[in-house]
A protein has these predicted regions:
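Cys-nucleophile CN-hydrolase/nitrilase-fold catalytic domain and related Cys-dependent amidase chemistry
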Residues: 21-22, 29-103, 108-109, 172-186, ...
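Short, acidic/polar
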Residues: 23-32, 149-156
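CN hydrolase (nitrilase-like) catalytic-core segments centered on the catalytic cysteine
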Residues: 65-83, 150-225
C-alpha cells in the first residue's frame, strides 16, 4: 500500500422505495443537499432507484436515460462523485450496471459479473465480462456489485492496480455474517481499502435488510465513522 492523500467517502445506507425511481431520486436529492461540501464520493446501495427487482424490461434505462442524466447534474451541482448501480439496457441486453459519475462529467460503468442465480438474476440480466479501474483524486478505485463479493479471484489486486474496492449491494439479513466477514477478507487479501454499502428495510419480495455498511483499511480495521 502506498501513501496517498486522504479521500472523504460518504455512505448512504437507506431503505429503497420499491420500483419507484421518482421517489428514490427525490429522497437522494435531499441527502445530497446535506452532504454538499463535506465529502468527495457518495456511495449508494445496489439498484438504488428501484430495489433488487427482476423487472428488467420495464425498469431498464440506457446510459442516456433520466436516472444517469439526473445524477450527472447533481454530481456537478454538489461537486461530488456519485456511485451505485441501476437497471440498464444496452444493445438489447439488460445489465445490473454500477456507475461512477464525477463532478467534471466523467461517466464510468461496470456491469455485474456474478449474477445471483438463487434470486433468478441470471434469467433477467446479462453478465458483464470486464472490471474497471477508475482514477479519482489520486486514488484508483475498483467498483464491484453485491454477489461479486463471494468471488475473490475477480477482485484480486494484481500488481496493486487499485487502492479502494467498492461493493454496492442489496445483501439480506440471513446472509449478513458472510457480508461482514468477506468485506474484511477482501481488504486483507488485496491490501487495499474496502467500502461496502448495503440497504435497509424490506423489498418487494419480502426480503429484509439491516445495512451493515462498512469501510475497512488494508489491515482489516473498520474505519467507518
Amino acid at each position: 500500500l502506498t501513501i496517498m492523500d486522504s479521500i472523504r467517502v460518504s455512505i448512504i445506507q437507506t431503505d429503497i422505495v420499491w420500483e419507484n425511481k421518482q421517489e428514490n431520486l427525490r429522497l437522494l436529492h435531499e441527502k445530497l443537499q446535506s452532504l454538499r461540501g463535506t465529502t468527495e464520493i457518495v456511495v449508494l446501495p445496489e439498484m438504488f432507484s428501484t430495489g433488487f427487482s427482476m423487472q428488467s424490461q420495464t425498469l431498464a434505462e440506457p446510459n442516456s436515460g433520466k436516472t444517469i442524466s439526473t445524477l450527472k447534474q447533481w454530481a456537478s451541482l454538489f461537486q461530488l462523485a456519485i456511485c451505485g448501480s441501476y437497471i440498464a439496457t444496452d444493445n438489447g441486453q439488460f445489465y445490473n450496471r454500477a456507475f461512477f459519475l464525477t463532478p467534471e462529467g466523467e461517466y464510468y460503468f461496470y456491469d455485474k459479473r456474478h449474477l445471483f442465480r438463487m434470486g433468478r438474476e441470471a434469467e433477467h440480466f446479462s453478465a458483464g465480462n470486464k472490471r474497471i479501474i477508475i482514477p479519482y483524486h489520486g486514488w484508483n478505485i475498483c467498483l464491484l456489485v453485491c454477489y461479486d463479493l463471494r468471488f475473490p479471484v475477480w477482485s484480486r489486486n494484481v500488481k496493486n492496480e487499485y487502492d479502494l474496492l467498492i461493493y454496492v449491494a442489496n445483501w439480506p439479513i440471513p446472509r449478513r455474517l458472510a457480508w461482514d466477514a468477506l468485506l474484511r477478507a477482501r481488504a486483507l487479501e488485496n491490501q487495499c481499502y474496502v467500502c461496502g454499502v448495503n440497504r435497509t428495510g424490506m423489498d418487494g419480495y419480502h426480503l429484509k435488510y439491516n445495512g451493515g455498511s462498512k469501510i475497512y483499511s488494508a489491515f482489516g480495521e473498520e474505519i467507518t465513522s
